[in-house]
Each structure stands twice: as structure tokens, then as C-alpha cells.
């Protein structure tokens, strides 16, 4: 491709709305452009890389035994009502009505559609296992779309669905897809961790997420260096023991604490650590109000709370000031577990029951109570773990110290059991002629997210450093001055030879300054650069690798072979 013909509107300045390096560089490199918030168009260079990610995914899904199909993005409400997800997913679902007032959604995922499709066609255990996948545009009405391709309202996704006759078969399909995902992300040269994840609205069975590690990741990952334990902060089991005081139970005492509404302020007033307090938080869970009491130095894990309450995630919100005042009789900041109004259900993290003579909110503005003890002064429903993991917590597998790092979720896999087959009455006949529900799995890869995650891991101050397998073009041949015959002719000759060998190559024949050409090549991240410049008359070119910034002058007759050596193994 001649760059004089290429549509590549590069930018020198960083767009003000772009926060992450991947978003900045995709815009600056002329690979994407925003239509509206959370909706992007792929330009030629970006689309070439997108198709390469898709092709890697396609090859590995085929290798894992999945078959490609394509389903409708427009889905009827009735299917989602049958599984209970029309209400559960909440405002993130893009909903619409046709001219006959029938309700639809633009699919964020396709469990309902694929189950409805298969149940009408697949009748016997002899047709199992089956795994179908598609690569398709999905929709999610993000409250705050940001970070470019990382959190958008329209995104391209590979979603696969497996059908098996029993749990053993489902687990085998799950394992096969896990291995397929590892091959996908290995070929994309991503540094990633496989972590336990929360299934959320997908179901309550086992799930794992593939996290590309990045300081800009939206997810927090807890992991252990001493064993293979790794989980999202939403899923991580918190091993945290309260040090019990070696003292008797003291008499409670109400203390005047004016304008002392935070744990930090309380620690200063009482001159003690945060673990001497019990923190009580109030939530609105649908139409109910719930209170949660936890150690003062910890945070509530809202995902664990949602799962325990068995409600859609969007229904859990922090209680409003008006609600707090109604159920505690106090302003925000003074809630405690004692004497809450009858309508409030109190849940207590189990660690609280071991804490002695602690300070709690008095449910009275500007007052706290000290020397409070669970069992004597208040009771609630004890819950084993309602805490959010913190750095330094102990690994639930081996007991060593956990570390926290950030990651970008690029893939996920779920064991769905019979959630969707039961909801949609999808059955087959087993060996004994008896009707059974399908055991299912669901498997997603964010295509655009993977592309952005690669940039997060492979870039510098000059631009992108694409791995060879994903680069929009593998080589750029730069003619420094097209007006000089020896440079133009040598560049054209090398370009033609590379094309004849099937190399994906750009020829920078633009009438731009050398600086512009070099900066553009570095910005768009072409892995190999061949420069026909001042020494072209002596049959000498510059050979440069973007990954290492290594440059050297070589004989022009050798450069094609050098390029082919770099491309071996692709």
C-alpha cells in the first residue's frame, strides 16, 4: 500500500478527552474516530489490526472444535423474560420498540438466542457436544462510556456457547475453551492472568476472567506468588482475622463526637487505629433497606452483598440522606448497628462478632458509643465474608500474603449449568430416551478490548509497538526524498520484492519531510522499517526494528532476507 493513497489522519497532539495511552494512540494514529460518546468508527489501519485479532480468535475457536455462526443482534423481550434477565440486567441493556409496540433489545450477549435456536434443532444426545461461536457487534448502554475501546456502548465481541449432555461434558468443553483462550492471548503476545471471576447476571456457577495486566486496568486482581490463586477483587475470598483483646466486656458509654463522620476523623479523636471501630453502612436494595456492619478498617464488597441478597446488581445503591435519617434518626455519618428501625435488616460480617469493646455510631447526630460488643449489645445475621480484599490479606489457598494489581478483562468463560436450558425449556433425549436439560457454557472475548490492551502493554512515548502478528502492516519502506531518483528507485525495488513474497508492506512515497515520515512510522507502530535515504546510491539502506529501536545500515540486497527472517513463525 502506498502511503500517498492511504487514509491515515494522524494527530500530533493528544486529544483532550483521551485518558488512557491506548485511547490516545488509537486516535493519534488515525485508527479510530469517535462518532458519539462510546461509539467509534474503525479507520483502515485500525480495521486491519481488528481483523487480525478476529482471525487469531477464529483460528483458535475452530481448533477448539467450535463452529462459526451469526445470530441476530435484535432480540425479542420474551426470551429474556423467560430467563429473568430482562429485569436483572437493568439500564445497561439497549431497549427499543418496533412500530407494533413490541419490545426488543440490542443484544449485549446471546445466551437466550442460542438456547432458543438449539432447542428447536438439537434433539438427541448423539448430537452432543456442540459449540457455536460468532464474532458480532454487541451493545451496552454504559452510564459513563470512557477509555475509548475499553468501555464503549457498541463493541465487537466473540461469544461462544457450548452444549453438553452432563456436567462432566460441560467441564470438558470449559477446559477446551480455556486452553483455546490461552492460545489466543499468547499469539497476541499479551501478558495476562487467569483469575476467578464473579458470574453476575450470567449465572452462579464457576467462571474465570482473562486479565491483561496494566496499570490502567479497570479491574483489580488479587493474586498469590506462592501458588496459583488469583481472583478479581469482586470474587476474592478475604482471609482476615481480628485480633481479640484479652479483656472483659466493658460498660457502654455514649460519647459526644460533633462533626466526626468518618473513620479517619474518629481515629484522630479517639487516638486509636481504625480496627477499633465497627463501620455500619446503609443500602437500598430494591424496595428494602439493609445495613451492613464490618470492621472499621475494611470496605464492603458490594458484589458479595448483591449475591447474598440475590438481587440484580443495579438494584443495590447507597441509601440516600433521607433514608439514612428515617431509619437511624441521625445525619449521615453516625449510623450504627444498635437500635435500627424495624424495617432495616442488619447483616454482620463474621469478623465483627470477635471484636471486643469497639466504637460504633449511636444512630444519633454527633454521638458514638464505645465498648460495644456483638451478642450483648446488638445482633444481626452473621455472614462469613462481606469484605473487599486488600493488599496484605492472606491467600485462601496457601496462607501466604496476597498482592493486588490492575488488569483489563479481555476474555471470560462461564459454566452455566442448566440456567438457560431450564429457563427456556431446552431439552434433549438421553441414552434412555428420557428428556434432559442441556448443560451449557458461555465464552466471550472482547476483540476491540484485546486490541486496546495490546497497546497498553506495547507502547512508548513515540507511539505504538505492535507485535508482528497484529500490526496493520508488517513493514514500512520509507523513501526519504522521492525527488531523488536513487532513493525512489531503490525504495520501489525493495517494496516490489517484499510484495512478491506476500509481505504486508507500506511504501512511504509521500512528499513529506523525513521527520514527519519517521514520526508517523513510529506512531502507527509498524514493526519493521526499511529506509532508502542518503546512502541509496551506494545500495545501502537503514534497517530498524520498532520493538527495540535497533537501527543499522545494511546492503539493500540483504534487506529482504532480513525481513523474511523476522517474519518466520508467523
UniProtKB/Swiss-Prot annotation:
Top-rank taxon, per record: Bacteria
Gene3D superfamilies, sorted: Anticodon-binding domain (3.40.50.800), Bira Bifunctional Protein, Domain 2 (3.30.930.10)
GO biological process terms on file: prolyl-tRNA aminoacylation
Gene Ontology CC terms: cytosol
TM stretches of this protein: none
Listed SUPFAM superfamilies: Class II aaRS ABD-related, Class II aaRS and biotin synthetases, YbaK/ProRS associated domain
Similarity annotation: Belongs to the class-II aminoacyl-tRNA synthetase family. ProS type 1 subfamily.
Subunit field text: Homodimer.
Protein name listed in UniProt: Proline--tRNA ligase
Species this protein is from: Alkaliphilus metalliredigens (strain QYMF)
Name of the gene encoding the protein in the UniProt record: proS
